[in-house]
């Protein structure tokens, strides 16, 4: 008998069962692990940093807040504000909608970015599962999920995580067509 056992009484340890579940479901496992890590990073940065972590976040937050309040005019920032909003609308429209619904809170933008980051991890796992065994598909998804730069860029209010999610999804569509 082992001195300390994690045996659950139903045929294996809890860790082994969790790993078996993740290997069986690499796409959803990668998504939820990635989302959990990014959400934790977003919450931590909100608690530890007053303001924004990366200066460009402020631009997206400001133009989306103004747009959600109906105050983003063509005169704002000499026309650049409206131009930036329009040229990044794939990111600023959902952010503006969140601000309109729930108020202009930075965490909403961070959760939007975190979701895009999690989609990237899931897409990587799905793409890998097209060509590799499930264990390797999980490894691909978790690589994206835990890669430090991916965590950073998808836990701040920047459009980069959306771009990676769209690129990964495009690769996935091409692989399955």
Predicted regions located by residue number:
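Specific aromatic-rich, kink-prone transmembrane helix
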Residues: 123-126, 163-177
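Start-transfer (signal-anchor) and selected internal transmembrane alpha helices
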Residues: 1-43
């Amino acid at each position: 008998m082992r001195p300390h056992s994690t045996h659950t009484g139903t045929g294996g340890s809890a860790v082994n069962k969790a790993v078996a579940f993740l290997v069986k479901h690499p796409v959803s496992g990668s998504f939820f692990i990635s989302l959990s890590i990014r959400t934790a990073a977003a919450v931590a940065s909100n608690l530890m940093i007053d303001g924004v972590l990366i200066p460009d976040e402020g631009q997206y937050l400001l133009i989306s807040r103004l747009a959600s309040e109906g105050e983003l005019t063509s005169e704002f920032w000499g026309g650049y504000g409206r131009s930036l909003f329009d040229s990044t609308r794939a990111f600023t429209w959902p952010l503006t909608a969140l601000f309109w619904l729930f108020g202009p809170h930075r965490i909403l933008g961070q959760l939007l970015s975190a979701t895009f980051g999690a989609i990237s991890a899931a897409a990587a796992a799905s793409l890998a599962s097209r060509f590799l065994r499930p264990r390797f598909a999980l490894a691909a998804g978790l690589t994206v999920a835990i890669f430090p730069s991916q965590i950073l860029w998808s836990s701040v209010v920047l459009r980069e995580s959306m771009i990676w999610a769209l690129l990964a999804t495009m690769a996935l569509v091409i692989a399955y067509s």
